[in-house]
């Protein structure tokens, strides 16, 4: 019910957002981190590959999402803080930011399903079962910029990495063994 209203229920907020101090289920822009996300999209729209963007961010010492959380004192242990301070941008981190619809203001929920109750295996839910709410929170990029970035990613990485395929579900998987 809360997801269908576009209320944010996740644990960690996406990089570039903060929880609204008046309502923890709403996202507001983080004035610093949202600029970093905006930069990532701008670099992608200029035709840069995700690996090139990661190198640019590392060269300019832009903190990774994990390192940014450490700097903002959202750390649970000294060991974790030490590990995260050594973190660096990767093409995978950049790719996941560019694919996240939250940056265009769209809430996407119920993305995963558990086909067998009490089993700890989850699968990506079909698109028609996912909850999608446009303009549920402030956007860092316009929907047009987001869609253009998706086209750039598809040209550079192809359909496989972009996640446009579904894994076949065998009905006897996990039940019959050879």
Report residues per predicted region.
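Conserved catalytic breakage-reunion loop centered on the nucleophilic residue
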Residues: 1-177
């Amino acid at each position: 019910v809360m997801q269908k209203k576009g209320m944010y229920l996740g644990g960690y907020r996406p990089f570039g957002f903060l929880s609204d101090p008046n309502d923890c289920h709403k996202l507001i822009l983080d004035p610093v981190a949202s600029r970093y996300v905006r930069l990532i999209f701008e670099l992608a729209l200029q035709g840069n590959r995700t690996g090139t963007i990661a190198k640019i961010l590392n060269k300019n010492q832009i903190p990774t999402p994990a390192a940014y959380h450490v700097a903002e004192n959202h750390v649970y242990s000294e060991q974790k803080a030490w590990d995260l301070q050594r973190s660096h941008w990767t093409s995978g981190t950049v790719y996941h930011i560019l694919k996240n619809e939250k940056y265009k203001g769209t809430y996407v929920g119920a993305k995963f399903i558990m086909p067998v109750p009490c089993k700890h295996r989850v699968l990506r839910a079909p698109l028609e079962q996912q909850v999608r709410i446009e303009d549920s929170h402030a956007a860092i990029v316009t929907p047009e910029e987001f869609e253009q970035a998706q086209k750039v990613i598809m040209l550079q990485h192809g359909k496989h990495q972009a996640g446009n395929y579904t894994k076949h579900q065998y009905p006897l998987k996990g039940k019959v063994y050879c």
